């Protein structure tokens, strides 16, 4: 750490540095301020007479004067104590910045545009770097444009909390910073700005106790990297609680990672419902996106829509019993995109009922493929072949269960698969009917696709073993289609059966299905079979 000798500076106005290392760093004062373009004294400017010609020289003068008055021999100022021509030194400094402010004996916050009035109008509260400079040090003394004392952090605590939306307990160090969920911490940086896009991420490293290399030139990718590093260190799902704040361009789906702190503006009142260390989720960054272990949900909305959703294990502190869920769109085998609606995320609003899907794992996409397609939709390009199943209108949509779950999309009520010669299968069983169940097979043959369906009654005597084989073993062990067909035959099922009689509510019905080849690029990019199941009473 490179420090300025305050006493030597006071004697002759020359900036002299002394380097210290972790075990022998003396007490020091630290300056927090907003930079003036071209007027700050940099490390290269410290040799006279260049330094004295810049306005920033007075900041060094006053910081040293205040430090000497407080009995402190050394000061640290970000403009001149870092050799920014050295990328290694700059990286070390930025990664250490929070700790340096935290360990300072006192922090002098110079508000260059404050001369009485309302603190919230000061530029200091709108800059990215000053966020950690307010939180990290225990003692912060504020000075107006004339370097007159304007109060300290404790005397201004209530006002500072109101201006920044940061809990007073965190500002006063009575409550640990880690007690605030990830989304809440991001919300403190909302509407703050930095000169360079990358610094919107780099200025938050200390807030999340993260270290990562500096890559100036990467632009907003820095904020993506920051979120990925946070995910590597915590299971706090509130990181997905952001809402889209950019210009709405009609995109129906988004990445699961936010584009910047502004997306977290609404999250200042969020609180965790469970400790991330003991919640039922695990997250890992992969080359596809975020690999999740834990449940996700199927939710029904007031408008009748069925959507997948992810519970974020957090809630608004004013509604602690209402968990926040975000809608998802299934794009591939247990692969999800984030669904958007009318330019903002639908966070549990309008949900009437939900049930969990306890899949082994699923993936949240952090990068989407081509956003503009000449035909079809972003969903359909993941599906080369689809089998849609339509049941009578009185069958509740939320009660239709399909396996394998990874190839069944509840929202569209379709099985989907890739362009492959491998034979595929799917089994769908609705609640609210007479026990009927549809098993489907499809495969590519001679450059075309063939479909075969079998309808059976799962409530018949002796079917318990079949149900276990299909809904437990076939699902868990990922049976291929040939094995599933063998299971059906072993249990006496006539493969290819297209109709049967069932008893439901004391009446007899004939249940049958029809197969139609359709073309719907919104559902599927390739072959699309539409299966319509009918149920007619038998007199």
Task: Tell where the protein language model's regions lie, with residue ranges.
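Amphipathic alpha-helical interaction motifs in eukaryotic regulatory proteins
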Residues: 32, 61-69, 95-98, 102, ...
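General structural concept
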Residues: 39-96
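Extracellular/periplasmic catalytic domains that process cell-envelope and extracellular macromolecules
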Residues: 21-27, 100-103, 123-124
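Long, low-complexity, serine/threonine/proline-rich intrinsically disordered regulatory regions
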Residues: 3-11, 27, 34-50, 70, ...
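Short amphipathic alpha-helices and their capping/turn segments at secondary-structure boundaries
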Residues: 16-24, 63-66
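Short acidic catalytic loops
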Residues: 31, 67-87, 101, 107-113, ...
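Intrinsically disordered, low-complexity acidic/Ser/Thr-rich segments used as protein-protein interaction/activation
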Residues: 16-21, 86-89, 109-123, 192
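Alpha-helical interaction elements in eukaryotic regulators
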Residues: 56, 90-93, 97-100, 127, ...
């Amino acid at each position: 750490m490179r420090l300025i000798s305050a006493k030597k500076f006071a004697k002759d106005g020359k900036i002299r540095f002394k380097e210290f290392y972790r075990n022998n760093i003396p007490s020091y004062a630290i300056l927090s301020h907003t930079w003036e373009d071209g007027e700050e004294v940099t490390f290269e400017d410290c040799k006279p007479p260049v330094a004295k010609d810049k306005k920033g020289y007075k900041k060094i003068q006053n910081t040293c004067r205040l430090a000497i008055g407080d009995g402190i021999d050394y000061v640290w100022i970000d403009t001149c104590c870092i050799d920014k021509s050295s990328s290694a030194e700059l990286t070390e400094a930025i990664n250490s910045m929070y700790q340096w402010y935290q360990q300072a004996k006192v922090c002098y916050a110079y508000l260059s545009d404050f001369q009485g009035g309302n603190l919230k109008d000061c530029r200091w509260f709108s800059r990215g770097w000053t966020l950690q400079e307010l939180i990290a040090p225990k003692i912060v003394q504020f000075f107006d444009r004339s370097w007159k004392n304007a109060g300290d952090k404790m005397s201004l605590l209530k006002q500072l909390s109101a201006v920044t939306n940061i809990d007073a307990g965190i500002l006063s160090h009575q409550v640990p910073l880690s007690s605030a969920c990830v989304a809440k911490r991001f919300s403190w940086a909302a509407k703050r700005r930095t000169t360079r896009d990358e610094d919107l991420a780099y200025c938050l490293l200390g807030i999340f106790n993260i270290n990562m290399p500096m890559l100036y030139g990467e632009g907003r990718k820095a904020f993506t990297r920051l979120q990925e590093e946070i995910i590597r260190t915590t299971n706090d799902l509130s990181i997905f609680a952001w809402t889209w704040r950019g210009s709405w361009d009609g995109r129906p789906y988004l990445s699961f990672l936010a584009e910047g702190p502004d997306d977290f503006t609404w999250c200042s009142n969020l609180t965790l419902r469970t400790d991330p260390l003991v919640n039922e989720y695990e997250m890992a960054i992969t080359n596809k996106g975020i690999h999740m272990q834990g449940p996700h949900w199927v939710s029904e909305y007031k408008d009748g829509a069925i959507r997948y959703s992810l519970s974020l294990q957090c809630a608004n502190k004013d509604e602690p019993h209402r968990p926040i869920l975000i809608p998802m769109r299934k794009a591939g085998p247990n692969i999800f995109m984030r669904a958007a609606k009318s330019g903002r995320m639908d966070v549990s609003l309008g949900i009437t009922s939900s049930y969990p899907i306890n899949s082994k794992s699923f993936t949240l996409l952090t990068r989407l493929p081509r956003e503009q397609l000449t035909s079809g939709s972003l969903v359909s390009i993941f599906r080369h072949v689809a089998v849609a199943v339509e049941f009578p209108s009185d069958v509740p949509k939320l009660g239709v269960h399909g396996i394998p779950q990874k190839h069944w999309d509840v929202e569209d009520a379709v099985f989907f698969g890739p362009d492959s010669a491998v034979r595929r299968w799917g089994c769908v069983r609705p609640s609210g009917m007479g026990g009927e169940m549809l098993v489907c097979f499809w495969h590519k043959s001679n450059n075309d696709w063939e479909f075969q369906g079998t309808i059976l009654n799962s409530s018949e005597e002796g079917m318990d073993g079949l149900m276990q084989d299909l809904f437990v073993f076939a699902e868990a062990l990922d049976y291929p289609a040939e094995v599933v067909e063998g299971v059906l035959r072993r249990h006496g099922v006539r493969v290819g059966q297209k109709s049967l009689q069932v008893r439901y509510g004391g009446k007899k019905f004939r249940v049958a299905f029809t197969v139609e080849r359709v073309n719907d690029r919104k559902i599927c990019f390739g072959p699309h079979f539409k299966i319509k199941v009918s149920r007619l009473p038998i007199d």
